[in-house]
């Protein structure tokens, strides 16, 4: 294995020996000075459906043997009160004693969301980002100094993986760590969004910016490319960093988090989760429905990346830019698909090259065009409006007086407002506005803990 470092802003920790299995005692000692809390965002279907329940139960069995976690917060979405009680029964059955159930549909946490919304912090959009954001508030209310996130659909989870994930932040004082792993299951390659969208898109952007010598754009692109698995949901934050961060509330949450880390952190690590393949629940392919599945995820990811370049570095988007980027993306994706086909043959894996090419052309290409249209359409709108005015003599005197220049200048000054990814504010900002909010959250947690203890 090549364990050389390729980016000075990112440390990569590889599994070079079995010595990593002995790090749990170090984590226990470190947790005495750094209160450590794990967040598990989950839908009710993770434990109520026959298909998902064994995966969730295995996660509970593994977590019951982890000794350095002060609390485990289960951020529960789309659940009834009865399903929240069912979760409490499961946690007790499998020996999870230090749990907190954060039922976002329950009256207690609804009241917290209402307080935040009434104060002007828009947290209306449902999803993983909103769920995690509230869990981070709960963790802070409980005094956490180190906060981890673990997805609830990992089919191959073992507690050793969690130990590795926490080690950089808890034991080595990094600000952030992120898991990477091999996505292989059922004798085939997975990780389609990473392999067929994120990597070729980032490489296409890098190719474009290298051609014109735009180094300021390359810094962010190179940073994102340095992560071996940008879309992994398994991360750990030092609380001092987490409090300053914003979080996306759409499918771009993982990429957006990396961009926020790029902006705000200096001591960052990625950790090899396991030497064995990693598997979790897969998104459905839905080219006919732009609001679901991989298509929606792809649009959100592309929008998040381009938005960061627009807001952070002042990238100007035009029809030509989007079209040229799409053509470059298709070329790069074709090159990578050839390499994946060769690698699959080398490793005797099943590989459907036609299906991968269809996904690139039928879903991801259209997602890039759709996201590009979102960014470029305001420019076309102004241009079309000016053409309409110039075709009518009644408006010529206004155009002669500089109306067109005023409109274009106004658009340029305000273009950053057109590219905002749906996101939360930082917890630092909330605490400035609502200094008692953590006390309110703590009161809800205590009340609901007493309830779940009796059921």
Task: Name each model-derived stretch.
Residues 1-62:
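N-proximal low-complexity "stem/linker" segments adjacent to membrane-targeting elements
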Residues 1-14, 85, 287-455:
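Terminal low-complexity segments of carbohydrate-biosynthetic enzymes
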Residues 83-142:
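Active-site-proximal specificity loops/subdomain of glycosyltransferases
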Residues 143-155:
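Short beta-strand-to-loop acidic/aromatic patch adjacent to the donor-nucleotide binding site
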Residues 249, 259-276:
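Catalytic donor-sugar/metal-binding loop of nucleotide-sugar-dependent glycosyltransferases
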Residues 271-292:
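Active-site donor/metal-binding and catalytic loop motifs
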């Amino acid at each position: 294995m090549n364990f050389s470092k390729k980016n000075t802003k990112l440390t990569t920790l590889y599994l070079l020996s079995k010595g990593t299995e002995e790090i749990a005692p170090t984590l226990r000692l470190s947790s005495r000075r750094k209160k450590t809390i794990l967040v598990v965002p989950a839908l009710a279907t993770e434990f109520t459906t026959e298909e998902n329940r064994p995966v969730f139960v295995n996660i509970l069995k593994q977590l019951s043997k982890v000794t350095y976690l002060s609390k485990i917060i289960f951020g529960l979405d789309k659940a009834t009160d009865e399903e929240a009680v069912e979760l409490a029964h499961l946690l007790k059955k499998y020996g999870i004693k230090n749990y907190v159930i954060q039922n976002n549909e329950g009256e207690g946490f609804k009241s917290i969301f209402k307080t935040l919304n009434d104060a002007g912090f828009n947290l209306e959009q449902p999803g993983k980002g909103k769920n995690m954001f509230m869990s981070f508030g709960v963790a802070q209310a409980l005094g956490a100094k180190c906060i981890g996130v673990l997805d609830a659909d990992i089919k191959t989870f073992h507690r050793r993986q969690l130990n590795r994930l926490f080690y950089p932040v808890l034991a080595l004082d990094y600000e952030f760590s992120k898991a990477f792993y091999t996505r292989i299951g059922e004798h085939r390659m997975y990780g389609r969004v990473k392999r067929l969208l994120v990597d070729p898109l980032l490489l296409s952007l890098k190719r474009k910016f290298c051609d014109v010598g735009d180094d300021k754009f390359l810094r962010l692109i190179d940073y994102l490319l340095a992560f071996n698995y940008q879309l992994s949901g398994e991360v750990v934050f030092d609380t001092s960093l987490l409090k300053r961060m914003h979080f996306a509330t759409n499918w771009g949450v993982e990429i957006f988090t990396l961009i926020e880390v790029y902006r705000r952190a200096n001591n960052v690590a990625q950790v090899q989760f396991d030497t064995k393949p990693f598997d979790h629940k897969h998104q459905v392919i839905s080219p006919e429905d732009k609001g679901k599945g991989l298509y929606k995820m792809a649009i959100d990811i592309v929008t998040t990346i381009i938005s960061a370049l627009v807001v952070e570095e002042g990238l100007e988007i035009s029809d030509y830019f989007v079209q040229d980027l799409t053509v470059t993306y298709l070329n790069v994706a074709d090159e990578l698909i050839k390499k994946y086909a060769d690698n699959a043959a080398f490793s005797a894996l099943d590989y459907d090259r036609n299906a991968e090419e269809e996904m690139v052309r039928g879903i991801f290409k259209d997602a890039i065009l759709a996201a590009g249209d979102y960014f470029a359409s305001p420019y076309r709108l102004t241009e079309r409006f000016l053409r309409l005015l110039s075709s009518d003599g009644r408006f010529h005197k206004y155009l002669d007086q500089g109306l067109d220049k005023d409109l274009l200048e106004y658009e340029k000054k305000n273009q950053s407002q057109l590219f905002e990814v749906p996101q939360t504010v930082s917890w630092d900002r909330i605490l400035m506005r609502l200094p008692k909010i953590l006390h309110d959250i703590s009161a809800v947690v205590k009340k609901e803990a007493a309830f779940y203890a009796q059921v």
